[in-house]
Amino acid sequence: SDIAKDKAARLLKKRGSISSLGSHDVKPRGSFSKTKDSVSTVSYIDEPGHHDDIQRPAILVENTYQMGPTKRFPVASVNNILKDVLTSYLQEEKYEAELCRQMTKTISEVIKARVKDLMIPRYKIIVLIYIGQLNDQGMRVGSRCIWDPANDTFSSYSFKNSSLFALANVYGVYYE
């Protein structure tokens, strides 16, 4: 017990912390415990009134006055990423509902990571993946967005094999 107190005191001195080592005379409430001493530590405490009188200066950050992107969203590069990822992940796959559900999550994360690797500053990246069974049916997918047509854009790629289809959309929305 004394060894534990000494060790705790040394650690507290090194860290500059406050300890309630003086509470060793507090006995446990129940008779089921054989421990006689109590050791508790606080790694950091702010003394009351210490910082209350000091006003910290506000951090001022200057505006960049940048109203448009320095680098445009590379639609062609993103389109190549979409083609590459969809083809590599789905070329030999057969449609299975549970597998395709997991594949949409995986493919969207891979595409998002690869688009982020292009390091396009100040663009939010949104990736949507649709995978369905190819069974002589039709489907229309539409999207509507409120955005700035001068800076915001998208890239889209559709893929088919013998049993499934996939559509990948990547939206690049400029964030000021």
From Swiss-Prot:
GO terms for cellular component: cytoplasm; cytoplasmic dynein complex. GO terms for molecular function: dynein intermediate chain binding. One of its GO terms (biological process) is microtubule-based movement. InterPro entries: Tctex-1-like (IPR005334), Tctex-1-like_sf (IPR038586). CDD domains: DLC-like_TCTEX1D1. Belongs to the dynein light chain Tctex-type family. PANTHER family: DYNEIN LIGHT CHAIN TCTEX-TYPE 5, T-COMPLEX-ASSOCIATED-TESTIS-EXPRESSED 1/ DYNEIN LIGHT CHAIN. This is Dynein light chain Tctex-type 5-B. It comes from Xenopus laevis.
